[in-house]
Every structure is written in structure tokens, then in C-alpha cells.
Amino acid sequence: MSRRDTSQHHLTCSFCGKSQDEVKKLIAGPAVYICDECIELCNDIIAEEIRMEDALGPDVTKLPKPKEIKEFLDEYVIGQETAKKVLSVAVYNHYKRIERPAKPGDVEMQKSNILILGPTGSGKTLLAQTLARMLKVPFAIADATNLTEAGYVGEDVENIILSLLQAADYDVERAQKGIVYIDEIDKIARKAESPSLTRDVSGEGVQQALLKIIEGTVASIPPKGGRKHPQQEFLKVDTSNILFICGGAFAGLDGVIQQRIGKKTLGFGADVKKKLEKKAGELLLQVTPEDLLKYGYIPEFIGRLPMLASLTELDEDALVQILTEPKNALTKQYQKLFDMEGVRLRFTDGALVSIAKEALKRNTGARGLRAILEGAMLDIMYEIPSQNTVREVVISEDVIYHKERPLLVYEQSASSAVA
């Protein structure tokens, strides 16, 4: 029941009792009133409860099973079936290990950090992002090419944890159960198989620096970034339960694998050349730790990334599927934008195939699809908001290949077609 000051006829908040003169806003409900201060307090209580739930990380009793994780990945990532299974199992085991820590005398379970190998635009980053979104954990992306050993010009590896802290709004508990994706990890391989006597700022040195945070350490993280603010207080972050996913294209690794396979087949008198004529993507599926060692990684670094997932190159059919099938497919995003203007957007089958072929020609994989679409759609997206009579836009292969204008269906034409 609402409270009223009968002498002054002033309304009061049903929860704190303050009058309408004491608060900025008083909102009326069925026989009750609530002030802006009580609303803000309720929001703070709810936000704190949500924050506490997030800080606990994924509940093992509610943790999705590997099949459920893969089904979620299927909604956003086309193909790459084996890699999705590897990731689903690794992520499930990782968070199960966190929620059920080993007791004294128990078998200690190794951390399931993951190494993803695959060509540009095959879905490495998307897989990691989708996993983090499903599990509702903080997520950060780092570029290995920007990393150097401490004391050299470039980013310290601790900045990776700083990015994760920022994604967790500086909540250390949440950050300690987050996911980090390190891209271009192939770029920090040693340039030669034998150890160098000189300092390798971008190779073995970075591997050694990354090794500590990947395997698990208590890192001292400067909240404002390291070198420019030497006097600041440090945050202590335990990286033992952070899942690290490293990815790269690994150009040239197929040659290392091919050489190993070739040596095994030479003694059997087989047609070696024919056996070795395989696509790079197929060869990456056969990668072993020994191949990575020969490629330029130190044994300790390989040992901290026990789960290997190889992605295959995307063909034309897969790229067409990527354009249309995932929940957030590019064509669906554009159709939503046009729908906001009251216009239907349609892509012909020929247009979809043309976009896929152009991406293959550019050798950019799925990553290049957006750039191709944006180039084709720029002019029409510029014009449509100013044209009130357009009801449908049709994108054909000529729009993609020959830069022709899309077919526009106007209101009168649409009405005639219905009649």
C-alpha cells in the first residue's frame, strides 16, 4: 500500500518512505510508489548477485557436456567437425578440473591448453570467441607478433593478462577463470631448429616468457600497463585456471610434416610423390609434437599446449554456408539492417557463389567475406535510407562481379505484383 501525507497530499515511496519532494522521481504502480533511489538500490543488488555468480565461473553441475558445447559451436561455425570436438572436450575437462580440484594424494590433472592450427580465415578466432560467449567467462585476444621479452621494446606478455582483467572489469576472481586467445602464435617459432647463441627477442625468448603464464603462475599485473606507470600498485593474478588457446596459420609446417611422412614411405617402394601431393590443410591434421619441435618451438612450450586442433581450408560450398547458415551470418546481418528501413534484402544463389569465389581468389577465407560484401553494398546502403518507396533490393552475381547496381523493387511494383 502507498503511503500518503494526508495533510499535504504528498505521495511517498512505498519502500523507503521518502516524499516526492525528497527524491528526483517517484514512479507509480498499482497502489504503490517507488522512488529513483530505491530503483537504483535494487539495480545494485541485482548487479552484485550477477557479479558474484559470474565470479564463481561455470558451475560444474550446469557445465554443458561436450556434445552440448559442440552443438552450440555448430550454430556459429561451419564445418571443422574434428576441431570442434577437440575443443568441446578440452573446454569441458578444463572447467571440470577447476570445480573439482585435486585433493592431497589424488591424481593431478594437467591443464588442457589448446593449440589451433589452420589457414587464415578458417575460424580459429571465432571458435575461441564462441566458447567464451557460451560459458559467460571473460575473454581476451592477444597478437603474438607484438610480444617481446621483458626489457625489450614491445608488449610484455603480462599485458595479455591485463587485457583479460579489463574484460572482467578488473574482477580478479572472474579473470582467473577466463579464456585467452593468442593469435599468430606461429610467428614466435625459432628461425632455426638449433638454439641461437644471440638473443631472439621475437622467438624463443617470447616462448619462455609465455611459458610461465600459460602453465600457471601468480603474475603481478600493473592495472594501467607496465612501463609508463612504474609507481602503481600491482594486482596479483593466478593464471593456473585461465584457459589459453593459441592459434596460427603455420605456413611451412606442412612441409615439415610432408618430409616426415616421406621418410616413412621411402622404404616401401611406394609412389612417394603421389602420396605427398596433399593439401596443406590435410597435412596439418597429421601434425605431431615432433613436427612442432622441428618447426621451431621449445619442448616445454609444446608440452604446455597438449590439445591440438587442426582446421581445414574452407572450400566454396563451406563459404556459401558461412554466408547464410550461422545464427549471425553476414547475409542475415545485412537483411536485419535493411529490415529496419522497411526494405527486404535478397541475395540470389549466383551472388552467394560469386562472393565465395572472390574470397577464395583473394585467399582470405571467411575473413574476406565481409570486405567483399561491404564493397558491394556500400552505395545501396548509402541511398536506401533516403528512398521511401523501395520495398525490395535484390543482389545478383552481376553486382559482385561487374559492380552493377542492385535490382530495386519499388512500392508500386510490389503492389502490382501482389495484385
UniProtKB/Swiss-Prot annotation:
Output one GO MF annotation.
ATP-dependent protein folding chaperone
What InterPro entries does the database record attribute to this sequence?
A: AAA+_ATPase, ATP-dep_Clp_protease_ClpX, ATPase_AAA_core, Clp_ATPase_C, Clp_protease_ATP-bd_su_ClpX, ClpX_bact, P-loop_NTPase, Znf_CppX_C4
**Residues bound to ATP:** 119-126
Q: Which UniProt keywords apply?
A: ATP-binding, Chaperone, Metal-binding, Nucleotide-binding, Zinc
Q: Name one GO cellular component term.
A: HslUV protease complex
At the top level of its lineage, which domain of life is listed?
Answer: Bacteria
Q: Which residues bind Zn(2+)?
A: 13, 16, 35, 38
Annotated ClpX-type ZB domain ranges read 1-54
Could you mention a single GO BP entry for this protein? cell division
Q: What does this protein do?
A: ATP-dependent specificity component of the Clp protease. It directs the protease to specific substrates. Can perform chaperone functions in the absence of ClpP.
Return the HAMAP family for the record: ClpX
Which NCBIfam families does the protein's record reference? clpX, PRK05342.1
Subunit-structure text? Component of the ClpX-ClpP complex. Forms a hexameric ring that, in the presence of ATP, binds to fourteen ClpP subunits assembled into a disk-like structure with a central cavity, resembling the structure of eukaryotic proteasomes.
The similarity annotation says:
Belongs to the ClpX chaperone family.
* Protein name as annotated: ATP-dependent Clp protease ATP-binding subunit ClpX
The top of its lineage is:
Bacteria, Pseudomonadati, Thermodesulfobacteriota, Desulfuromonadia, Geobacterales
What is the gene name? clpX
